[in-house]
Amino acid sequence: MVDMWEVEIPSLTGKKKRRAYAYLPNDYDLTERHYPVLYMFDGHNLFSDSEATYGKSWGLADYLDAHKIPLIVAAVECNHEGNERLSEYSPVDFTFRNGEPVKGKGKKYMDWLTGTFKPYIDENLRTLPDREHTAIAGSSMGGLMTLFAVAKYNKYFSKGAALSPSLWAYGTNLVEFIEKSKFSKDTILYMDYGSKEFDKAGIAKTNFCTATGALIQKGVNLTSRIVKDGTHSEASWERQIPIFMKVLELN
């Protein structure tokens, strides 16, 4: 089942409300068990087609129910105003493809997630709150934020899945960002890109391969994949759920 409520992120949007979601295993009310938690971005796209931005969700609740996976998933919808999703889901300032400058507010978002949202989840649900049992995942800009979270908030997250991460936002600073980050030796990271996402100029593939190499050099336990016929879409990311769940040892 998926519970929904409203939250505020004062540092980003003041008292404006946005939806938060928590997937709970079907046996949650039947046991006293405590569960690992997977935090995710773009919560509105995860569970219900009717709420998904483009009419297709990840179908995540259906997958978890069908496979009886003992896991809590906690997520918040993005900011839908203008380019605010890009802003909140980027750790760095960048210029969008239309030439518009975007101010990176990703650190503020992660400070709220780790300082307010995670404590709320741990206090109100039967979680295993330690780092070993806490993971994070997302796609596109959420994939970029997953990489940022695992790199800069490693004391909270021992594992992450970055699907089709928007590495272009870092520009030429991508390698420097990875090299200056501190990863615990037990950090597990899944990262992929769809073969149909690569541009003709090869920039996306270069960024992906560069990030892969830098992460391996840092000693991260990395599983890196190019998904055959993969696209930048919820339908494509849904098909990767069994794979990254296995890599993150959440299944």
Positions of PLM-derived features:
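Non-catalytic cap/lid and distal C-terminal segments of serine-dependent acyl enzymes
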Residues: 1-251
